[in-house]
């Protein structure tokens, strides 16, 4: 049977190719990429196919995860000379970086610990790490955003909405699930004589950039960097973080939220609503931020309870459970 009786050859002949028509069609169906990208990938893959097959990286393995197995990554796998049988348990871990595959295998650690130890020492800000990563699923509720772990500048949560509680200067916005949880916490607080309010919530990349530039104009670079997040690395852009104040602070009864009784109630009860105190006292070396008693982050009730019960910060949670999403090395 001829190729043209099976597939539409004319589609592939619109670009220069090496006539691997059946592979083009198979990869096209698996990856949904453009004709040009499919031809480039398959022609490049074909040149490496013998080496890849020898190591166990068959087309069935590669085509199922085309975003991971880029041509550059295929060359890395060949150079590393690590068989798929050994590599697959590490590559199954969210956030695994192919360029580190040999280090994972040689580490002797469990797959999760190997990936986190080798590729992500910067989860803990006290450890030196020159790498930076872009988060590929910034909508994940458990996303770790900090210096070294950023979201795209054009990321805007699709489910942002106004939060129906008092605010200091402008209406606060959060993602729907976080907004609903904060409204419930506000109502329950009122019943016990506490009245929280929003000081700041969602900030776009551009808004964070303006704040960042303002701080750097006022302070020296090192001090400013400890006070404000680099644009793209601010939790506020994910729509899950809120800076709180209270009616008592706005009325002038207390100077800051951290001094108000409302803060003590929120700190003790936030986890019941899915929030954690993101930057607690004496954890700045690991979080990379100074103590912010007003900054609460929504992570969902299950994660918040575990973090609360174990005395963790979000970094501890990630180091224990790993990432729930993939990251791209910049």
Predicted stretch roles:
Residues 1-200, 205-330:
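Extracytoplasmic cell-surface/polysaccharide-interacting catalytic and binding patches
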């Amino acid at each position: 049977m001829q190729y043209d009786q099976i597939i539409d050859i004319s589609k592939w002949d619109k670009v220069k190719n090496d006539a691997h028509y059946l592979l083009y069609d198979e990869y096209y169906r698996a990856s949904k990429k453009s004709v040009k990208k499919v031809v480039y990938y398959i022609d490049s893959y074909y040149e490496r196919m013998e080496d890849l097959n020898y190591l166990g990286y068959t087309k069935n393995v590669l085509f199922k995860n085309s975003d991971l197995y880029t041509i550059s990554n295929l060359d890395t796998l060949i150079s590393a000379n690590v068989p798929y049988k050994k590599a697959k348990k590490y590559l199954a871990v969210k956030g695994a970086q192919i360029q580190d595959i040999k280090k994972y295998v040689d580490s002797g650690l469990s797959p999760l610990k190997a990936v986190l130890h080798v590729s992500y020492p910067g989860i803990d800000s006290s450890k030196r790490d020159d790498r930076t990563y872009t988060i590929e699923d910034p909508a994940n509720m458990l996303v770790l955003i900090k210096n070294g772990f950023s979201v795209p500048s054009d990321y805007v949560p699709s489910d942002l909405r106004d939060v129906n509680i008092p605010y200091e200067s402008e209406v606060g916005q959060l993602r729907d699930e976080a907004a609903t949880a904060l409204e419930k916490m506000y109502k329950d607080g009122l019943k016990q004589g506490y009245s929280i309010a929003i000081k700041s919530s969602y900030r776009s990349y551009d808004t964070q950039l303006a704040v960042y530039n303002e701080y750097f104009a006022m302070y020296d670079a090192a001090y400013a960097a400890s006070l404000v997040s680099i644009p793209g690395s601010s939790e506020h852009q994910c729509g899950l973080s809120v800076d709180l104040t209270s009616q008592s602070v706005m009325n002038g009864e207390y100077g800051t939220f951290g001094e108000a009784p409302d803060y003590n109630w929120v700190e003790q009860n936030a986890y019941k609503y899915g929030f954690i105190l993101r930057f607690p006292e004496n954890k700045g070396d690991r979080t990379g931020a100074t103590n912010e008693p007003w900054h609460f982050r929504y992570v969902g009730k299950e994660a918040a309870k575990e973090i609360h019960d174990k005395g963790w910060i979000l970094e501890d949670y990630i180091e224990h459970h790993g990432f729930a999403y993939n990251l791209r090395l910049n």
